[in-house]
Amino acid sequence: METLCHRLNVCQEKILDCYELDSDKLVDQINYWTLLRYEAAMFYAARERNLRTINHQVVPATTVSKQKACQAIEMHMALQSLNKSDYNMEPWTMRETCYELWCVAPKQCFKKGGITVTVIFDGNKDNAMDYTSWKFIYIYDNDKWVKTNGNVDYTGIYYTVNSKKEYYVQFKDEAKIYGAQQWEVYMYGTVITCPEYVSSTCSDALSTTTTVEQLSNTPTTNPLTTCVGAKEAQTQQRKRQRLTEPDSSTISPLSVDNTNNQIHCGSGSTNTGGHQSATQTAFIVHLKGDTNCLKCFRYRFTKHKGLYKNVSSTWHWTSNTKTGIVTIVFDSAHQRETFIKTIKVPPSVTLSLGIMTL
């Protein structure tokens, strides 16, 4: 028992060291996933011996430990294979090699440089969806890794391998989901109409200025091509609008388009997580993720007590006992931005902004 406790302590300390190192070397990411394999294996072995806690940590259920072990093995093997390719000397951050990004479409491949693609259905700005195109996609094809570029056209979002387009988002299928007869695709505020429907769609297209200011969350310095989707042959009677999102933002490892591991918040941004009312309010951050990971992360950032006002213990909603939550309270929006820029958030932890009435 003492040996297991010691090994788990050493393993988790090294995992936290990987977070603080913030390396962009592939060998360091392989080491990180090796440690996660060891941690999951130790939790699994402890549960098999009917141990409920280790070092005051709750031992996950056998199925949970097994699932995490399988994920770690999958990522470890994929990264080891990538390390033997021509791309092993490229920068590889923890964010770019996390399991969540590995599972995002296109699945089971590595991706870099996310670009937001906004699709407006039926010309209604309230019935819009955001998708992600990738600047670089690394595909394992014919026993080797191939680097290709992501692209967008009026049909969907795709990449090209062996001169063949592989679509991982089809706008025609998405239009059926949202009850649309036609769609418009915007990227960086630029719109290009489908050649077959120039006359019927150009008059209804939104202006580029409106798109840049209201729809695009990405810089407009690199104009990329986008397009307007064609009308569907059959008119669907039912139309579903996406509800307008509240004035709060959620930052997660997968939603950041940068390729580094730092979360950026512009000082001039008006999205501060909500509007202050006449009552006393406080700016907050919710950290969501695995309970054990949150406890370790909370312990590490307590040495930066000047960057926040107060922090809660780990809690969870009664309907979801697997996901833990830590709430951090700030005196001002500026203090919150400083905290986000200073503290490195693990890729398995989701960061959400908001306000709370006191």
From Swiss-Prot:
Skewed-composition ranges (Polar residues): 246-255
Region spans: Transactivation domain: 1-199
Keyword tags: Activator, DNA replication, DNA-binding, Early protein, Host nucleus, Isopeptide bond, Phosphoprotein, Repressor, Transcription, Transcription regulation, Ubl conjugation
Gene3D superfamilies: 3.30.70.330, E2 (early) protein, N terminal domain, subdomain 1, Papillomavirus E2 early protein domain
Location of the region described as DNA-binding domain in the Swiss-Prot/TrEMBL record: 281-358
Compartments, record wording: Host nucleus
GO cellular component, one term: host cell nucleus
Crosslink site: Glycyl lysine isopeptide (Lys-Gly) (interchain with G-Cter in SUMO): 288
UniProt record, GO biological process: DNA replication; DNA-templated transcription; regulation of DNA replication; viral DNA genome replication
Transmembrane segment boundaries: none
Pfam families: PPV_E2_C (PF00511), PPV_E2_N (PF00508)
Top-level taxon: Viruses
InterPro entries: E2/EBNA1_C_sf (IPR035975), Nucleotide-bd_a/b_plait_sf (IPR012677), Papillomavirus_E2_C (IPR000427), PPV_E2_N (IPR001866), Reg_prot_E2 (IPR033668), Regulatory_protein_E2_N (IPR036050), Regulatory_protein_E2_N_1 (IPR042503), Regulatory_protein_E2_N_2 (IPR042504)
Post-translational modification: Phosphorylated. Sumoylation plays a regulatory role in E2 transcriptional activity.
Residue ranges of the region described as Disordered: 224-255
GO molecular function, one term: DNA-binding transcription factor activity
Function: Plays a role in the initiation of viral DNA replication. A dimer of E2 interacts with a dimer of E1 in order to improve specificity of E1 DNA binding activity. Once the complex recognizes and binds DNA at specific sites, the E2 dimer is removed from DNA. E2 also regulates viral transcription through binding to the E2RE response element (5'-ACCNNNNNNGGT-3') present in multiple copies in the regulatory regions of the viral genome. Activates or represses transcription depending on E2RE's position with regards to proximal promoter elements including the TATA-box.
Similarity section: Belongs to the papillomaviridae E2 protein family.
HAMAP family (alphabetical): PPV_E2
Subunit-structure text: Binds DNA as homodimer. Interacts with protein E1; this interaction greatly increases E1 DNA-binding activity. Interacts with protein L1; this interaction enhances E2-dependent replication and transcription activation. Interacts with protein L2; this interaction inhibits E2 transcriptional activity but not DNA replication function E2. Interacts with protein E7; this interaction inhibits E7 oncogenic activity. Interacts with host TAF1; this interaction modulates E2-dependent transcriptional regulation. Interacts with host BRD4; this interaction mediates E2 transcriptional activation function.
Protein name: Regulatory protein E2
Species of origin: Human papillomavirus 51
Lineage of source species: Viruses, Monodnaviria, Shotokuvirae, Cossaviricota, Papovaviricetes
Gene: E2
